């Protein structure tokens, strides 16, 4: 009952942000911290130029199970199985042990996996200090979505240059923001058409199985209010008990690890997540 009450409170908090009183409302936050991209989340509504209605966007619900939670010894088999169970994308967390403390897999593992799932959509989340070094290797393994952290870049010009390099290499561009980074820090890149997706982390990146941080969902609401047709991905602690908070805020691309791979019925787990997104976004 206590968790249900907390979920209801957060949903009430987030819903007004995602459904701002006017279509041209934009949500801004202030209180700047040390990083050029990090801003805390004191929320203020500000008027912007004409925008489309906030929650009427054309992107369908996309479920991207994280292979960080699969059995690494059976990665190919479990990748095939999770696709058969209804997964839209495969989420691959590449960590270098420097940008985040954990170390996972890189291009050689993805190259080995690709022949087993030749048609799969590789949704690669790079938690690395030098994402530019990964553009060519990830393109070679036919990565579809190349998502890097703005916190790993020196500034806006560096982000824009990297976005262009990723596009030139034939991949879609995703930018990720950690819990301490504001949604506003990536708006300029979306406005300029440089970005296909924004990944909002709802846990600190680096390890799977963490608890969902509902305050981070407000950033999805900020982005959805400004960009009705943007792919907004949420990653961290997503499960049937938290999916509706993220979906009502505007997330339509859902990363789920343990809630899928730790379930006895992967099809049912994926269907439940998809239904949670569709409830608010279709």
Describe each model-derived feature in a short phrase:
Residues 262-282:
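C-terminal helical cap(s) of enzyme catalytic domains, especially alpha/beta-barrels
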Residues 75, 93, 138, 198, ...:
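Conserved, mostly hydrophobic/aromatic
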Residues 56, 83, 111-115, 139, ...:
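Surface-exposed amphipathic alpha-helices with a cationic face
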Residues 1-20, 24-37, 41-44:
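N-terminal chloroplast transit peptides
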Residues 148-153, 202-208, 250-269:
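Glycine-rich phosphate-binding active-site loops on the catalytic face of alpha/beta enzymes
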Residues 133-137, 143-222, 226:
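Conserved anion-binding
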Residues 54-141, 153-156, 173, 187-194, ...:
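Conserved N-terminal beta1-alpha1 strand-loop-helix module at the mouth
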């Amino acid at each position: 009952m206590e968790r249900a009450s907390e979920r209801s409170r957060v949903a009430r908090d987030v819903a007004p942000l995602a459904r701002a009183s006017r279509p041209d409302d934009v949500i801004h936050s202030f209180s700047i911290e040390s990083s050029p991209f990090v801003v805390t989340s004191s929320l203020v509504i500000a008027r912007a130029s004409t925008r489309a209605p906030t929650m009427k966007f054309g992107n369908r619900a996309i479920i991207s199970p994280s292979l960080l939670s699969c059995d690494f010894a059976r990665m190919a088999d479990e990748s095939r199985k999770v696709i058969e169970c209804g997964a839209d994308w495969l989420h691959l967390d590449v960590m270098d042990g420097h940008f985040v403390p954990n170390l996972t897999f890189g291009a050689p593992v993805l190259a080995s996996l690709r022949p087993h799932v030749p048609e799969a959509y590789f949704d690669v989340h790079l938690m690395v200090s030098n994402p530019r070094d990964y553009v060519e290797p990830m393109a070679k393994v036919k990565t579809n979505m190349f998502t890097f952290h703005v916190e790993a870049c020196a500034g806006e010009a560096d982000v824009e240059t990297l976005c262009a390099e990723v596009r030139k290499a034939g991949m879609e561009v995703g930018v990720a923001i950690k819990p301490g980074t504001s949604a506003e820090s990536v708006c300029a890149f979306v406005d300029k058409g440089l970005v296909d997706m924004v990944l909002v982390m709802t846990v600190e990146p680096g390890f799977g199985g963490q608890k969902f941080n509902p305050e981070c969902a407000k950033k999805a609401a900020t982005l959805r209010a400004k960009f009705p047709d943007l792919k907004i991905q949420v990653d961290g602690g997503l499960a049937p008990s938290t999916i509706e908070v993220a979906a009502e805020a505007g997330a339509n691309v859902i990363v789920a690890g343990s809630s899928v791979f730790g379930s006895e019925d992967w099809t049912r787990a994926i269907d439940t997540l998809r239904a949670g997104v569709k409830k608010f976004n279709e």
